[in-house]
Amino acid sequence: MSSERLPGKVLKEVNEKPLLLHQLERVARSKHVEKIVVATSTNPADDEIEKFAKKGNISLFRGSEGDVLSRFEGAAQESGATTIIRLTADCPLSDPEVIDHVITKYLEQPNACKFATNAIPRSYPAGLEVECFSREALEIASLEAKEDYDREHVTPFFYRNPHRFFPLSVVSTINYSKERWTLDEQSDFYLIKKIMEALSQIKVDFKMVDVLNILDANPDWRKLNSAVQETPRLVKDNIFKGADSG
């Protein structure tokens, strides 16, 4: 809720419903996700998130604002999860089929693989990122990660230590990396609002392909947030043991 660029962004409404609820409903359509936990901070600014969760009977965990890694570990411990899917709340267009695809690829790997992601190298639209990792990997990272960046962003420790976590990159057969469907600034909200309002009239459970189709039918929409600058990535693409197209 304390976002500097767009305060309160996850509770902004489209079709009279908070974006966070839109996302949770979409994630709940995953065939593999068994439990959803909203992991927010103890910052009083996030009290509204707690109210939202209680109203909707949604599982909630509150932890450190800056040490998000410890917050995730606390949420995992409380939920009893052994395999964890990390999604950020600024991605209201999360696609359950993409989530399931990453989970499936992760589960197909040998036990040595403790982390899978479709985020690096970027081939999916920004806003459809999925990270899947073991509880064991999370506990190791929480115990050993010392850099502030690693603790704030949860998974960089995995990227820094590929020889220990054997990260798997799940890559789309078509490169959609120029698509931006994440929520950081007001212009992002304008685009997401247009997409949701248009597609909700056609189908409730719209997928990535539906978003691509409606953007192709309305090419000017992409210009709405084309000026937004993405935060540079710290981790390079060449750390992965391999890429799995799909």
Where are these regions (language model features)?
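Conserved donor nucleotide-binding strand/loop of the catalytic core
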Residues: 51-66, 77
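Acidic donor-binding/catalytic loop of UDP-sugar-dependent glycosyltransferases
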Residues: 68-73, 89-105
